[in-house]
Amino acid sequence: MTTLAIDIGGTKLAAALIGADGQIRDRRELPTPASQTPQALRDALSALVSPLQAHAQRVAIASTGIIRDGSLLALNPHNLGGLLHFPLVKTLEQLTNLPTIAINDAQAAAWAEYQALDGDITDMVFITVSTGVGGGVVSGGKLRTGPGGLAGHIGHTLADPHGPACGCGRTGCVEAIASGRGIATAAQGELAGANAKTIFTRAGQGDEQAQQLIHRSARTLARLIADIKATTDCQCVVVGGSVGLAEGYLALVETYLAQEPAAFHVDLLAAHYRHDAGLLGAALLAQGEIL
């Protein structure tokens, strides 16, 4: 059976057909609508899936935000242009006439990445550092989503009580500092207005402010990982996302994690499925692995 998998992120929408063998084909991408209207997202999703839906028997969605009762509830509305609520499952069922499931994108990615690990690992945490910071937890070989879908939203744990305001309504969240948006927002002077990709490029060219912003992000993530180790006693942490997979970033995180007491050290791995983990994880879940 072929699954039409969809990944809804802060900057892009992706879709692909995934067979029972896990092979990804006919992958497509569109920019996430800047408009905060549900109709704009519906129209973009329609354009994304229309060339693929005739070849699938079901739909699986991995989306940023909290997924509850088939709807997207934005914990940080800024990540979707201000959109607060969207009926994901209902919309895709109407667009495709196919049975549909939905799950948080980082939770889906965690499940895909778990499948790629050695068989003796039963407890792991996945962290995505991209437009925002998200996560997924596998404990005892099972994906933990929580009764309300909130489990794994580790980007909204406290990093600095005097830090910047976060779009979730809290102050000093990891996401507000370590994410691509957080890196860009903190840029000043000639870097003001630059996005995270540009800041990474400038850091590689020796720009001191750009390097400091990236180190600040990596240091914040390392402290989060130490907290995760203390909370879950996980066997490894897998890091993905456009920032998490940027050249040299994970090595910086490892350097800062090594400065923590040994009890909080944990193996760090780059995401095996790179930017396709959310798509693949959603498809695996649709095959009945968990949901």
UniProtKB/Swiss-Prot annotation:
Enzyme type, top EC level: transferase
Entry's Gene Ontology molecular function annotations: ATP binding; N-acylmannosamine kinase activity; zinc ion binding
Amino-acid positions noted as binding ATP in the UniProt annotation, renumbered to this chain: 5-12, 132-139
Record key words, sorted: ATP-binding, Carbohydrate metabolism, Kinase, Metal-binding, Nucleotide-binding, Transferase, Zinc
Pathway involvement of the protein, from the record: Amino-sugar metabolism; N-acetylneuraminate degradation; D-fructose 6-phosphate from N-acetylneuraminate: step 2/5
Catalysed reaction, written as an equation: an N-acyl-D-mannosamine + ATP = an N-acyl-D-mannosamine 6-phosphate + ADP + H(+)
Binding site for Zn(2+): H156, C166, C168, C173
Signal peptide limits: none
SUPFAM superfamilies xref list: Actin-like ATPase domain
Presence of keyword Metal-binding: yes
InterPro entries: ATPase_NBD, ManNAc_kinase_bac, ROK, ROK_cs
One Pfam family this sequence matches: ROK
EC number of this enzyme: 2.7.1.60
PROSITE patterns named among the record's database cross-references: ROK (PS01125)
Gene3D superfamilies: 3.30.420.40
Subunit structure: Homodimer.
Job description of the protein: Catalyzes the phosphorylation of N-acetylmannosamine (ManNAc) to ManNAc-6-P.
Cross-referenced NCBIfam families: NactlManKinNanK (NF047821), PRK05082.1 (NF003461)
Family under the similarity heading: Belongs to the ROK (NagC/XylR) family. NanK subfamily.
Matches recorded under PANTHER family: N-ACETYLMANNOSAMINE KINASE, ROK (REPRESSOR, ORF, KINASE) FAMILY
Protein's name according to its UniProt entry: N-acetylmannosamine kinase
